Structure formats: C-alpha cells, structure tokens
Amino acid sequence: MSSLYQSMVAVIEQSITPLAGRLGQQKYVIAIRDGFTAALPFMIIGSFMLVFIFPPFSPDTTNGFARGWLDFSAHYRDQLMLPFNLSMGVMTFFISVGIGASLGRQFNLDPVMSGLLAFMAFLLVAAPYADGKISTQYLSGQGIFTALITAIYSTRVYAWLKQNNVTIRLPKEVPTGVARSFEILIPVLVVIGTLHPLNLFIEAQTGMILPQAIMHVLAPLVSASDSLPAILLSVLMCQIFWFAGIHGSLIVTGIMNPFW
C-alpha cells in the first residue's frame, strides 16, 4: 500500500502538478476566473431578491407573517424585480467588464479602458437595437459564452495595437485621462469594424445573431458538462490539484464556470 501510494504521488507530482501549474498561470483562465469573481457580489444580491419576491410559504397559509409577506411581494412584484433584473438579469455586463479588466491588466493595459472596450464589444453583438428598444435576451446567462469571446478578442486587439504602436499618442502636456481616451480610439474602431460586420454576416446567412449561433454550436458541449460523469470528473480533478498542493477550485471553476 505504501509503495502504491508513493507511486501515485510521484505520478501526480511529475505529470499533473506541472500541467495544473501552467493552467493556473494561464492568462485567459485567470481572466475568466476574475470576471466571474467580479460579478459574484451582484449575482448573490440578485439571487437573494428572489427570496423576497417569491416567499417560501404556501399560498393558502394562515400564518399572519407569511400572509403579509405573500401579499406584499405580490403587490410590489414589479418593483422588487428591478434589482434582480439589473443584477442577475445583466450578469454578462459584469463578467465582460471583469474579464476585460483582468486580461488588460495582465497585458499591461489600462484595466478601466480594456474593461469598457470588452463591455462595448459584447453589447455590439448581443444587444440588438430595434424600434427604440434594446433586446435583453442575451444579457443574462445565455450570453456568457459571447461575453467571454468578445472580451478576450477586444482585449487582445487592444494589446496587439498598443504593442505595435498603432495608437494615437498625444504630447505629455495633455492630461493623462484625455490621453488614455485618445489611445483607445483605434482599438474601438477596429473592434467595431470587425465584430459588427461579422455579426451582420452571421445574421444574414443563418438568421441568428452571434450569441444565438454560439449557443447553437456549443449546445452539445453544454449538455455534456451538466452530466453526472462531467461533474464527478471536475470534482475529482479539483481534489487531485489540491492533493498536489495547487488551488484546485480556482483552476477547475475558471475552466468550467462558463458551462455551469
């Protein structure tokens, strides 16, 4: 038993630990993890609001407190739904900004500007505007994959342009805030000039906007990730990483959060 245990430890240390270490330092895994972490407070508060909106009592209860709570929530349901709709209902806003800011920081970019650029890139393809209204269908969980892709893409474009000095540079005498705004003009133009035509092309060819197309392609993978074997494998890998002295939860959730 001792030799078997030592063999298992050796295999983990030689094979799994280096891989886990590389995953844990991977820029995109870190950015995705940070994006979901940034959105977490808003999602928690939004989830709590559902308890107030839908009290855990039977509609025919005779308890005075429960009856009052049910009547109050029914009468003010629209008002109580507002915090939920502006937190859980637009979770991809927070996720896209968090991913863009985290990835931008890792590429030595202005995290505020990279986060805002990621936010704009997501809105451009996921919130179609028609008849004076913006569609919110893909601003919640259905748009998570689109938020990941557009945030990573827009930040990479920003990083590449800055690394190759394809930016507008103002004299040092110009205030820093103004200079930062002009520096991101070209990245904004490139992101709009690539994502918007792509979205229009996909819609013309398939009748679906980009978030719909992404969800259609990834539907089998999402279904597979919700299966018992996938969940058991994720838990197993998490424990193996912990056993190897690595924060398994950060790595596994950073990869699997978009699917869960």
Question: Model-found features: residue ranges?
Answer:
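Membrane-interface interhelical connector segments
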Residues: F57-S73, M256-W260
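Re-entrant/interfacial helical elements at transmembrane boundaries that shape
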Residues: G98, L250-W260
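Signature of multi-pass transmembrane helix bundles
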Residues: S2-I44, M49, S58, F72-A244
